[in-house]
Protein backbone atom coordinates (compact mmCIF):
# COMPACT_ATOMS: atom_id res chain seq x y z
CA UNK A 1 0.00 0.00 0.00
CA UNK A 2 2.83 2.37 0.83
CA UNK A 3 4.37 1.88 -2.61
CA UNK A 4 1.05 2.44 -4.43
CA UNK A 5 0.27 5.51 -2.35
CA UNK A 6 3.63 7.04 -3.15
CA UNK A 7 3.23 6.22 -6.85
CA UNK A 8 -0.23 7.73 -7.30
CA UNK A 9 0.49 10.50 -4.85
CA UNK A 10 3.50 11.44 -6.96
CA UNK A 11 1.35 11.56 -10.08
CA UNK A 12 -1.13 13.86 -8.37
CA UNK A 13 1.68 16.10 -7.19
CA UNK A 14 3.11 16.29 -10.71
CA UNK A 15 -0.30 17.13 -12.18
CA UNK A 16 -0.83 19.76 -9.50
CA UNK A 17 2.54 21.33 -10.29
CA UNK A 18 1.74 21.38 -14.01
CA UNK A 19 -1.57 23.10 -13.29
CA UNK A 20 0.22 25.64 -11.12
CA UNK A 21 2.89 26.27 -13.76
CA UNK A 22 0.23 26.65 -16.44
CA UNK A 23 -1.74 29.19 -14.41
CA UNK A 24 1.38 31.23 -13.63
CA UNK A 25 2.43 31.33 -17.28
CA UNK A 26 -1.07 32.11 -18.55
CA UNK A 27 -1.73 34.99 -16.18
CA UNK A 28 1.80 36.37 -16.47
CA UNK A 29 1.18 36.42 -20.22
CA UNK A 30 -2.13 38.25 -19.81
CA UNK A 31 -0.52 40.85 -17.55
CA UNK A 32 2.37 41.29 -20.00
CA UNK A 33 -0.09 41.71 -22.87
CA UNK A 34 -2.01 44.38 -20.98
CA UNK A 35 1.10 46.49 -20.34
CA UNK A 36 2.46 46.07 -23.86
CA UNK A 37 5.31 43.63 -23.17
CA UNK A 38 4.30 41.54 -26.13
CA UNK A 39 7.48 39.52 -26.65
CA UNK A 40 7.31 38.31 -23.06
CA UNK A 41 3.58 37.66 -23.41
CA UNK A 42 4.24 35.41 -26.42
CA UNK A 43 6.88 33.50 -24.46
CA UNK A 44 4.50 32.94 -21.55
CA UNK A 45 1.56 31.89 -23.70
CA UNK A 46 3.67 29.49 -25.79
CA UNK A 47 5.06 27.78 -22.71
CA UNK A 48 1.59 27.58 -21.16
CA UNK A 49 0.19 25.95 -24.30
CA UNK A 50 2.98 23.38 -24.25
CA UNK A 51 1.58 22.29 -20.89
CA UNK A 52 -2.08 22.52 -21.89
CA UNK A 53 -3.77 23.52 -25.17
CA UNK A 54 -6.21 25.84 -23.46
CA UNK A 55 -8.44 27.67 -25.94
CA UNK A 56 -8.51 30.95 -24.01
CA UNK A 57 -4.72 31.03 -23.80
CA UNK A 58 -4.44 30.17 -27.49
CA UNK A 59 -6.79 33.04 -28.32
CA UNK A 60 -4.57 35.43 -26.36
CA UNK A 61 -1.49 34.12 -28.18
CA UNK A 62 -3.09 34.53 -31.61
CA UNK A 63 -4.10 38.09 -30.71
CA UNK A 64 -0.58 39.01 -29.60
CA UNK A 65 0.92 37.43 -32.71
CA UNK A 66 -1.40 39.66 -34.74
CA UNK A 67 -0.36 42.71 -32.71
CA UNK A 68 3.30 42.10 -33.61
CA UNK A 69 2.39 41.33 -37.24
CA UNK A 70 3.31 37.64 -37.07
CA UNK A 71 0.29 36.80 -39.17
CA UNK A 72 1.21 33.26 -40.21
CA UNK A 73 1.89 32.26 -36.61
CA UNK A 74 -1.47 33.73 -35.58
CA UNK A 75 -3.25 31.90 -38.38
CA UNK A 76 -1.72 28.59 -37.29
CA UNK A 77 -3.12 29.11 -33.79
CA UNK A 78 -6.63 29.94 -35.06
CA UNK A 79 -6.56 26.85 -37.30
CA UNK A 80 -5.45 24.68 -34.39
CA UNK A 81 -8.36 26.02 -32.32
CA UNK A 82 -10.80 24.97 -35.06
CA UNK A 83 -9.29 21.48 -34.87
CA UNK A 84 -9.52 21.25 -31.08
CA UNK A 85 -13.09 22.53 -30.91
CA UNK A 86 -14.38 21.70 -34.38
CA UNK A 87 -18.08 22.09 -33.55
CA UNK A 88 -17.77 25.69 -32.38
CA UNK A 89 -18.46 28.21 -35.20
CA UNK A 90 -16.91 31.07 -33.21
CA UNK A 91 -13.40 29.74 -33.87
CA UNK A 92 -14.05 29.67 -37.61
CA UNK A 93 -15.31 33.27 -37.44
CA UNK A 94 -12.16 34.28 -35.57
CA UNK A 95 -10.16 32.62 -38.34
CA UNK A 96 -12.25 34.48 -40.94
CA UNK A 97 -11.50 37.80 -39.24
CA UNK A 98 -7.80 36.97 -39.27
CA UNK A 99 -7.94 36.08 -42.97
CA UNK A 100 -9.61 39.43 -43.64
CA UNK A 101 -6.74 41.29 -41.98
CA UNK A 102 -4.31 39.26 -44.09
CA UNK A 103 -6.35 39.89 -47.26
CA UNK A 104 -6.73 36.11 -47.65
CA UNK A 105 -10.26 36.34 -48.99
CA UNK A 106 -10.44 32.75 -50.21
CA UNK A 107 -9.45 31.46 -46.78
CA UNK A 108 -11.96 33.85 -45.25
CA UNK A 109 -14.71 32.54 -47.51
CA UNK A 110 -13.94 28.93 -46.55
CA UNK A 111 -13.91 29.73 -42.82
CA UNK A 112 -17.29 31.47 -43.12
CA UNK A 113 -18.77 28.50 -44.99
CA UNK A 114 -17.69 26.18 -42.18
CA UNK A 115 -19.15 28.49 -39.53
CA UNK A 116 -22.46 28.69 -41.40
CA UNK A 117 -22.46 24.91 -41.81
CA UNK A 118 -22.26 24.57 -38.04
CA UNK A 119 -24.86 27.24 -37.29
CA UNK A 120 -27.00 28.93 -39.95
CA UNK A 121 -28.43 31.49 -37.52
CA UNK A 122 -25.35 33.69 -36.90
CA UNK A 123 -25.77 37.03 -38.76
CA UNK A 124 -22.10 38.00 -38.54
CA UNK A 125 -21.11 34.82 -40.41
CA UNK A 126 -23.01 36.05 -43.47
CA UNK A 127 -21.64 39.57 -43.00
CA UNK A 128 -18.06 38.29 -42.99
CA UNK A 129 -18.85 36.05 -45.94
CA UNK A 130 -20.00 39.15 -47.80
CA UNK A 131 -16.72 40.92 -47.03
CA UNK A 132 -14.87 37.90 -48.41
CA UNK A 133 -17.00 38.04 -51.56
CA UNK A 134 -16.15 41.72 -51.99
CA UNK A 135 -12.47 40.86 -51.68
CA UNK A 136 -12.98 38.25 -54.39
CA UNK A 137 -14.77 40.81 -56.61
CA UNK A 138 -18.10 39.01 -56.39
CA UNK A 139 -20.59 41.79 -55.71
CA UNK A 140 -23.68 39.67 -56.40
CA UNK A 141 -22.61 37.08 -53.82
CA UNK A 142 -21.87 39.86 -51.34
CA UNK A 143 -25.38 41.28 -51.72
CA UNK A 144 -26.90 37.81 -51.26
CA UNK A 145 -24.92 37.22 -48.05
CA UNK A 146 -25.76 40.66 -46.66
CA UNK A 147 -29.43 40.10 -47.41
CA UNK A 148 -29.31 36.86 -45.39
CA UNK A 149 -27.58 38.67 -42.53
CA UNK A 150 -30.30 41.33 -42.51
CA UNK A 151 -33.05 38.68 -42.58
CA UNK A 152 -31.60 37.27 -39.37
CA UNK A 153 -31.05 40.67 -37.76
CA UNK A 154 -33.37 43.39 -39.01
CA UNK A 155 -31.45 46.24 -37.37
CA UNK A 156 -28.01 45.09 -38.54
CA UNK A 157 -26.57 48.53 -39.32
CA UNK A 158 -23.18 47.33 -40.57
CA UNK A 159 -24.86 44.98 -43.04
CA UNK A 160 -27.15 47.73 -44.37
CA UNK A 161 -24.15 50.06 -44.74
CA UNK A 162 -22.05 47.51 -46.59
CA UNK A 163 -24.92 46.48 -48.85
CA UNK A 164 -25.54 50.13 -49.69
CA UNK A 165 -21.86 50.58 -50.54
CA UNK A 166 -21.85 47.50 -52.78
CA UNK A 167 -25.06 48.59 -54.51
CA UNK A 168 -23.63 52.06 -55.09
CA UNK A 169 -20.41 50.55 -56.49
CA UNK A 170 -22.72 48.92 -59.05
CA UNK A 171 -24.41 52.32 -59.53
CA UNK A 172 -27.72 51.02 -58.20
CA UNK A 173 -28.52 54.38 -56.62
CA UNK A 174 -32.19 53.72 -55.83
CA UNK A 175 -31.54 50.44 -54.00
CA UNK A 176 -28.53 51.87 -52.21
CA UNK A 177 -30.59 54.84 -51.04
CA UNK A 178 -33.23 52.51 -49.60
CA UNK A 179 -30.60 50.91 -47.38
CA UNK A 180 -29.22 54.31 -46.39
CA UNK A 181 -32.67 55.53 -45.40
CA UNK A 182 -33.13 52.39 -43.30
CA UNK A 183 -29.81 53.14 -41.59
CA UNK A 184 -30.93 56.68 -40.84
CA UNK A 185 -34.15 55.31 -39.32
CA UNK A 186 -31.98 53.25 -36.98
CA UNK A 187 -29.66 56.20 -36.24
CA UNK A 188 -30.34 59.59 -37.80
CA UNK A 189 -26.77 60.69 -37.01
CA UNK A 190 -25.03 57.74 -38.67
CA UNK A 191 -22.00 59.46 -40.21
CA UNK A 192 -21.18 56.76 -42.75
CA UNK A 193 -24.77 56.67 -43.99
CA UNK A 194 -24.96 60.46 -44.28
CA UNK A 195 -21.70 60.61 -46.22
CA UNK A 196 -22.73 57.87 -48.62
CA UNK A 197 -26.06 59.63 -49.11
CA UNK A 198 -24.19 62.84 -49.85
CA UNK A 199 -21.92 61.06 -52.31
CA UNK A 200 -24.87 59.56 -54.18
CA UNK A 201 -26.82 62.81 -54.22
CA UNK A 202 -23.77 64.69 -55.51
CA UNK A 203 -23.69 62.42 -58.55
CA UNK A 204 -27.38 61.84 -59.15
CA UNK A 205 -29.19 64.92 -57.90
CA UNK A 206 -28.08 68.12 -56.21
CA UNK A 207 -24.50 69.07 -55.31
CA UNK A 208 -25.71 71.76 -52.91
CA UNK A 209 -27.80 69.26 -50.95
CA UNK A 210 -24.85 66.87 -50.91
CA UNK A 211 -22.65 69.60 -49.44
CA UNK A 212 -25.22 70.18 -46.68
CA UNK A 213 -25.01 66.51 -45.69
CA UNK A 214 -21.21 66.53 -45.68
CA UNK A 215 -21.14 69.69 -43.56
CA UNK A 216 -23.67 68.09 -41.21
CA UNK A 217 -21.24 65.22 -40.64
CA UNK A 218 -18.33 67.61 -40.06
CA UNK A 219 -20.42 69.51 -37.52
CA UNK A 220 -21.11 66.26 -35.67
CA UNK A 221 -17.53 65.06 -36.00
CA UNK A 222 -14.84 67.49 -37.19
CA UNK A 223 -12.35 64.60 -37.29
CA UNK A 224 -14.18 62.58 -39.96
CA UNK A 225 -11.47 62.24 -42.60
CA UNK A 226 -13.68 60.91 -45.36
CA UNK A 227 -15.93 63.95 -45.01
CA UNK A 228 -13.00 66.24 -45.81
CA UNK A 229 -12.11 64.17 -48.88
CA UNK A 230 -15.69 64.21 -50.15
CA UNK A 231 -16.08 67.93 -49.49
CA UNK A 232 -12.83 68.76 -51.24
CA UNK A 233 -13.67 66.54 -54.21
CA UNK A 234 -17.11 68.09 -54.52
CA UNK A 235 -15.56 71.57 -54.56
CA UNK A 236 -13.04 70.45 -57.17
CA UNK A 237 -15.85 69.13 -59.34
CA UNK A 238 -17.41 72.60 -59.10
CA UNK A 239 -14.07 74.20 -60.11
CA UNK A 240 -13.75 75.79 -56.65
CA UNK A 241 -10.05 74.97 -56.49
CA UNK A 242 -8.99 77.41 -53.78
CA UNK A 243 -11.81 76.31 -51.50
CA UNK A 244 -10.93 72.67 -52.09
CA UNK A 245 -7.30 73.32 -51.15
CA UNK A 246 -8.48 75.07 -47.98
CA UNK A 247 -10.50 71.97 -47.05
CA UNK A 248 -7.49 69.69 -47.55
CA UNK A 249 -5.34 72.11 -45.55
CA UNK A 250 -7.80 71.85 -42.68
CA UNK A 251 -7.75 68.06 -42.86
CA UNK A 252 -3.94 68.06 -42.77
CA UNK A 253 -3.89 70.36 -39.75
CA UNK A 254 -5.95 67.74 -37.92
CA UNK A 255 -3.86 64.83 -39.21
CA UNK A 256 -0.45 65.67 -40.74
CA UNK A 257 -0.09 62.01 -41.81
CA UNK A 258 -3.25 61.95 -43.92
CA UNK A 259 -1.85 60.55 -47.20
CA UNK A 260 -5.12 60.82 -49.14
CA UNK A 261 -5.44 64.51 -48.27
CA UNK A 262 -1.95 65.19 -49.63
CA UNK A 263 -2.87 63.32 -52.80
CA UNK A 264 -6.09 65.24 -53.29
CA UNK A 265 -4.48 68.58 -52.47
CA UNK A 266 -1.85 67.76 -55.08
CA UNK A 267 -4.60 67.12 -57.59
CA UNK A 268 -6.14 70.49 -56.75
CA UNK A 269 -2.79 72.27 -57.03
CA UNK A 270 -2.20 70.67 -60.43
CA UNK A 271 -5.61 71.90 -61.58
CA UNK A 272 -4.56 75.37 -60.47
CA UNK A 273 -1.28 75.16 -62.40
CA UNK A 274 1.00 74.73 -59.38
CA UNK A 275 3.04 71.81 -60.72
CA UNK A 276 5.82 72.15 -58.14
CA UNK A 277 3.41 72.18 -55.21
CA UNK A 278 1.50 69.33 -56.78
CA UNK A 279 4.63 67.19 -57.06
CA UNK A 280 5.59 67.91 -53.44
CA UNK A 281 2.19 66.69 -52.26
CA UNK A 282 2.41 63.59 -54.45
CA UNK A 283 5.81 62.72 -52.98
CA UNK A 284 4.48 63.23 -49.46
CA UNK A 285 1.49 60.97 -50.18
CA UNK A 286 3.82 58.22 -51.42
CA UNK A 287 6.10 58.69 -48.41
CA UNK A 288 3.17 58.21 -46.03
CA UNK A 289 1.55 55.37 -47.99
CA UNK A 290 4.31 53.70 -50.05
CA UNK A 291 2.13 50.66 -50.71
CA UNK A 292 -0.04 52.94 -52.87
CA UNK A 293 2.80 54.68 -54.66
CA UNK A 294 2.44 52.67 -57.87
CA UNK A 295 -1.18 53.74 -58.08
CA UNK A 296 -0.49 57.48 -58.07
CA UNK A 297 -0.06 59.07 -61.47
CA UNK A 298 1.26 62.49 -62.31
CA UNK A 299 -2.25 63.43 -63.42
CA UNK A 300 -3.82 62.28 -60.14
CA UNK A 301 -6.55 60.58 -62.08
CA UNK A 302 -6.77 57.40 -60.03
CA UNK A 303 -7.94 58.42 -56.59
CA UNK A 304 -10.12 55.32 -56.36
CA UNK A 305 -7.04 53.10 -56.35
CA UNK A 306 -5.38 55.12 -53.61
CA UNK A 307 -8.34 54.68 -51.27
CA UNK A 308 -9.24 51.13 -52.28
CA UNK A 309 -8.23 49.57 -48.96
CA UNK A 310 -8.90 52.50 -46.66
CA UNK A 311 -11.32 51.35 -43.92
CA UNK A 312 -13.75 54.28 -44.15
Q: Which functions belong to the PLM regions below?
A:
Residues 18-56, 60-67, 94-103, 131, ...:
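Alpha-helical segment of the N-proximal tetratricopeptide repeat
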Residues 22-23, 55-56, 89-90, 123-124, ...:
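Helix-start (N-cap) detector for alpha-helical repeat units in TPR-like alpha-solenoids
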Residues 33, 66, 93, 100, ...:
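Position-specific recognition of the canonical hydrophobic site in helix A of tetratricopeptide repeat
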Residues 52-53, 86, 120, 154, ...:
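Short coil turns that delineate tetratricopeptide repeat
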Residues 60, 94, 128, 162, ...:
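Canonical tetratricopeptide repeat
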